[in-house]
From Swiss-Prot:
Active-site residue list: 182, 208, 304
Keyword Phosphoprotein carried by entry: yes
UniProt-annotated location(s): Cytoplasm
CheB-type methylesterase domain residues: 170-358
Pfam family, one: CheB_methylest
Post-translational changes noted in the entry: Phosphorylated by CheA. Phosphorylation of the N-terminal regulatory domain activates the methylesterase activity.
Family in the record: Belongs to the CheB family.
Protein name: Protein-glutamate methylesterase/protein-glutamine glutaminase 2
Classification via InterPro entries: CheB-like, CheB_C, CheY-like_superfamily, Sig_transdc_resp-reg_Me-estase, Sig_transdc_resp-reg_receiver
Lineage: Bacteria, Pseudomonadati, Pseudomonadota, Gammaproteobacteria, Pseudomonadales
Length: 358
């Protein structure tokens, strides 16, 4: 017997977006668009009669903006919400507000060539809706998420950094922490970083997120945290009390120069369909930090970071996976656990302790 279809409500003031998305989604066997509304006021009329499994929501609309509508939804009946946002600075900042309010995913759309983009990105949108439908709703208001990037042939970290044959390095006492996360990661990272004291090991982070979003995200976390948080720049030194977030659209790797660790921010192909990729970061940490590092994999769909965490463990790093109960999507941690890559499985509220104490 076939399973129940995912019921979707579309809310977007663009008639083109509504028309194209309805056509795309209704052609997908496991998805059904229950209604399409031009703004949140119309959407609320639809919700009075039927409630969807997932809401796809624009953020900038007349009469009522998407953020106000989202907060209303999350306070009355928490529901997985996928944000459709333009790749502008204003759009990025507004979308981050949406993530804080409880949205699950960001899908970015251009300001021109919209129809062709939506058709070409159909697989991305479908993946985001499926992830949202399978998300842990009870965690939505507490810790939320990020974008699914454009699908491509699935390259591994070998495309950026070939696997090393050994891990012998000069001695150093500096300790670093590498964190990888995706769907659910924006507020999961907020929960972890805001729990840290000013004095803590240097941290490098890959959060799956488009370009233009990461700078705003880092700035927001910096304002909430005792430690310094910023978007990484090429050749930045990893310092105690500093968290560096990989820029969207770039890979980030850790390197060593004498006793000091630095980051390289580079271009390159999508790895595990992502750029930045957690596997790329974790492999570089395994090679250049080894036993001086801790690797942490948190909420997110897919398997990016699972193999890299195993490489870190094999290189002598301590490793942690977030537990299922506190994840929005138990994908990346689950795959790492399957590979026996995680020494410890911890709830979100305890993960900061793994940063402070190896």
């Amino acid at each position: 017997m076939p399973g129940k279809k995912i019921s979707v409500l579309l809310v977007d003031d663009s008639a083109v977006v509504r028309q194209v998305l309805v056509a795309i989604l209704n052609e997908t066997p496991d998805i059904h668009v229950m209604a399409a509304a031009s703004d949140p006021i119309f959407a609320m009329g639809k919700l009075a009669h039927e409630w969807p499994d997932v809401i796809v929501l624009d953020v900038e609309m007349p009469r009522m903006d998407g953020i106000t509508f989202l907060k209303k939804i999350m306070s009355e009946r928490p529901t997985p919400v996928v944000i459709c946002s333009s790749l502008t600075q204003k759009g990025a900042e507004t979308s981050l507000q949406a993530l804080s309010a409880g949205a699950v995913e960001i899908i970015t759309k251009p300001t021109t060539g919209l129809k062709n983009f939506l058709i070409e990105s159909a697989a991305e949108l479908v993946a985001a809706i499926r992830a949202a439908a399978n998300s842990n709703v009870k965690n939505l208001g507490k810790r939320t998420a990020t974008p699914v990037l454009t699908p491509a042939s699935k390259l591994t970290a070998d495309a950026i950094l070939p696997a090393a044959s050994g891990h012998s390095m000069a001695q150093t006492t500096e300790r670093i922490v590498a964190i990888g996360t995706s769907t659910g990661g924006t507020q999961a990272l907020e929960a972890v970083l805001t729990a840290l004291p000013r004095v803590c090991p240097g941290i490098v982070i890959v959060q799956h997120m488009p370009e233009k979003f990461t700078a705003s995200f880092a700035e927001r976390l910096n304002g909430l945290s005792q430690i310094e948080v910023r978007e990484a720049r090429n050749n930045d030194r990893i310092l105690p009390g500093l968290a560096l977030i990989a820029p969207g659209g770039k890979h980030m790797m850790v390197t060593r120069s004498g006793a000091y660790y630095h980051v390289q921010v580079i271009d390159g192909p999508l790895v595990n369909r992502h750029r930045p990729s957690v596997d790329v970061l974790f492999r570089s940490v395994a090679r250049f930090a080894g036993k001086n590092a801790t690797g942490i994999i948190m909420t997110g769909m897919g398997d990016d970071g699972a193999r890299g965490l195993k490489e870190m463990l094999d290189a002598g790093s301590s490793t942690v996976a977030q537990d299922e109960a506190s994840c929005v999507v138990f994908g990346m941690p689950k795959e790492a656990i399957k590979l026996n890559a995680a020494q410890r499985i911890m709830p979100l509220q305890e993960i900061h302790q793994a940063i402070l104490h190896r």
